[in-house]
Amino acid sequence: MIEEHGGIVQSDGSIQPIDMSSFEKKSGSKKKEKKLTPKNINLLVQQSNQSVKQQKDAQKKQTSNGFNNNNSSNIHDGGMGGGSSSDNMDGSLDYSINNILKKEYEKINRNQVSSFSDVENFSEDDEDDDAEDDDSSDDQVNNKKNKPKKPSKLMKHDSVDGKNKMTPISSTSKKKVQHQLKEKNKKKGIKNDKKKSKPTKPTPKSVSSLPPPKIDSSTNNDNGSSDDDNSAKFKKYLFSIEPQKFEHTIEIPPFREINEFYDQDDGYSILSKNKYIGNWRDHNQYKSFDFDEEIDNQLDDNIINNDNDNDNDNDDDNDNDNDNDNDNDNDNDDDENGEDNGEDLNINNNNNNYNNNNNNNNNNNNNNNNNNNNNNNNNNNNNNFTSIQNDLDLQNNLNLSPIIITSSSSSSSSSPIGRNEIKTSLVSESGRSISSPILIPSPTLSSKSNNQENDDPTLVKSNNSFIKSIFSSGKIKRNSLQEYSIRNS
């Protein structure tokens, strides 16, 4: 630990001063002043530890029995030469063990220093200073040998007076990048043609069609190449994913391509204030729906169709005229048998009474049929009312104004306007088809249309081609209305 006063705290608590002479700039030297970096601090701590150990080793040498400086070489070799006594043998053995431990400790410290330097990023000046420190001490010579060699700088060819001259390329120049690209292209056999256009990137596939990349787990992860390949594959997979659209996204309908609507504030035109806010109904412009007024007018004009008329014409009128072709004249040519004639007359009278009873029964049946027809007509009226009520409920739920599209050109003069010319089938969310007039949020069309036959803004007169163009172009989209169908009668 380095204190502010420049000392190293030892394990026993004592402070050893640091020799800062190597960090001071000498007079007359062109070298820069050294800086106290973490790497240099680590080296200083290592030097101090080694000096302390050397002192302890010297004390051990002095205190060891029979130790002599003259036979130090024999002790280094094996510790078996020199003294003949067992004490000398024990002392030399202890010294050899300490010497081996010392070498192992130095190796460990060297590895720690190298690993520490790999983690930290030092400038070139710091590396030069470290090299000078290594030259200053004998123990750091091995550290210098173990350092990895710097890669040779790329060279470029410059023709000077017809001779090629090699000059180093700076790391930040564009020529270095171009040189690297040329080398790669030479290996791949590709000519460096600047005029060539860049290849178009393939269109990314969707997530469903593109499987995730296979990561090779069999390769050794000690070498960084396999991890780099897997990460590159995974990055390529991520960037090739096309974002999927949400199923229930809100589609903004396009503005109407009719000049008449550009002045209207209906949410579709370019000049509209409510552009793209999704407002299908504006209470300031749209006429509210009145049940009493609108439905009465529609029923009078026979706009709402009822396919199930249930006329019940009752083709079997059951006239039962009972002409009684068997008039039973019975002229009774046999005048002599009067009794027989009387019996025949009685039989005929009975038959006539029977026929009269049948006629009365038939008349009663006809009355019952008429009552049934009246009931059917009442039911039809009720059905008409309920269908109108259902249409009103659907209309209120959708927040649509009741605009009824009819055709201005009628095929027959006797039929009322819009009768059996346009039929629509609206399908609700429950799947039940509802026969109803077409509802679209365009009340302003009637005010500017050429065919103004009625002042009612809810009644729109137009031709079938315009109606088909609206529904086929997708201008009207509703979640509850899943299907529109328009057909001529």
Curated annotation (Swiss-Prot):
Top-level taxon in the UniProt lineage: Eukaryota
Compositionally biased tracts (Basic and acidic residues): 155-164
Basic residues: bias regions: 144-154, 173-199
Composition-biased stretches (Low complexity): 43-53, 64-77, 344-389, 433-449
Region (Disordered): 1-94, 109-229, 300-389, 428-461
Start-end of Acidic residues biased regions: 121-138, 308-343
Protein name as it appears in the record: Putative uncharacterized protein DDB_G0287265
Source organism per UniProt: Dictyostelium discoideum (Social amoeba)
